């Protein structure tokens, strides 16, 4: 089964995990980027997203230069913003047909997973969303709180899926 890693990363933590998975699995990887980049000021982004959360605002993302139909398994990486998948990932899930695909999500956060995985399942009702992994970092840091062994076990599990 052909695997693709799809992720969005603001602080670099989700990117770090996505690339760790890519190194081990040697599969394709796709970084989601917004058309209008987020501010480099973390507090500004947090405030903006808190204000737009109630409206379910979804940012426009850059065109994907990949044929998703060629992949059976999507390894989906998202930071958790306001207890749910970040807006760019929600845009990706809303705009792309992932029916029949297996989605293995991982979420990076500082300990506030919230409804992230349930929302991914809701956005992909005709996909098989399973084997979710919550990866926790220290607040405002790239220091992992989740044991590295747990992450390696997660990657090993994905590798065994055929």
Give the predicted meaning of each segment.
Residues 104-146:
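Short, glycine-/small-residue-rich phosphate/pyrophosphate-handling segment
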Residues 76-77, 105:
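Redox-cofactor binding/interface segments in oxidoreductases and associated redox assembly factors
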Residues 1-76, 83-85, 90, 94, ...:
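N-terminal beta1-alpha1-beta2 submodule of the flavodoxin-like/Rossmannoid cofactor-binding fold
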Residues 86-90, 100, 117:
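Generic internal hydrophobic packing segments that stabilize the cores of diverse globular domains
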Residues 48, 101-102:
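P-loop/Walker A phosphate-binding loop and immediately adjacent motor/lid segment at beta-alpha junctions
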Residues 79-82, 109:
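Short glycine-rich anion-binding loops that position phosphate/pyrophosphate groups of nucleotides
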Residues 12, 77, 100, 111-114:
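Glycine-centered flexibility sites
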Residues 68, 94-100, 123-128:
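Short, conserved loop/helix-junction motifs that constitute active-site signature segments
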């Amino acid at each position: 089964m052909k695997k693709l890693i799809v992720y969005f990363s603001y602080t670099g933590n989700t990117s770090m995990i996505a690339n760790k998975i890519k190194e081990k699995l040697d599969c394709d990887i796709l970084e989601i980027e917004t058309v209008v980049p987020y501010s480099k000021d973390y507090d500004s982004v947090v405030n903006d997203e808190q204000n737009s959360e109630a409206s379910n605002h979804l940012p426009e993302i850059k065109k994907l230069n990949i044929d998703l139909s060629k992949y059976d398994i999507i390894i989906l990486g998202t930071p958790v913003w306001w207890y749910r998948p970040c807006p760019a990932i929600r845009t990706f899930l809303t705009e792309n047909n992932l029916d029949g695909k297996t989605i293995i999500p991982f979420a990076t956060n500082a300990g506030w997973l919230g409804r992230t995985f349930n929302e991914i399942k809701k956005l992909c009702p005709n996909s098989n969303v399973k084997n979710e992994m919550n990866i926790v970092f220290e607040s405002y840091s790239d220091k992992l709180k989740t044991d590295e062994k747990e992450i390696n076990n997660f990657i090993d599990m994905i590798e065994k899926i055929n």
